[in-house]
Amino acid sequence: RESIKREGGHRSNVIERIMVGVSSNASDTGQLLRKASRIAGQLNAEWFAVHIETPSESVKNIGTRDFVALLDNINVASDLGAETVWLKSDDVVKALIDFAHDKGVSKVIVGRTHQPRWRRWLKGDVVARLVADATDLDVEIVATEEREDSR
């Protein structure tokens, strides 16, 4: 958002920038992207949809269905007004944080992980690590599943 900050009596324009991570294996990424788009709209912010391709999730290692879903999500992000970015890295969290710093991102939006606990323990929990390591960024974890009516 364009806001005015007073620093020593001077006024300066600050543009809010938001980043959302796009995974190749998340079935609810489309919903996450729509939420990020709404948040960016409310803040009048620029936003980025960033996919980090790791060696284990390279194009040749993920299934056709996951790859098509990833491309669909990248297209959805672009249609919603995001600048889409595809990076390669061994370390998803470090790549996201480095990108955020390079682009002046102040808020990172991620979806709550739905991986089984054993998989998070074995492979590491990207969301938890992002919260722990991105101490200078606001990290917002959003629910991406529809809540059932509890009547």
Residue ranges and their predicted role:
Residues 1-150:
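Structured cytosolic domains appended to multi-pass membrane proteins
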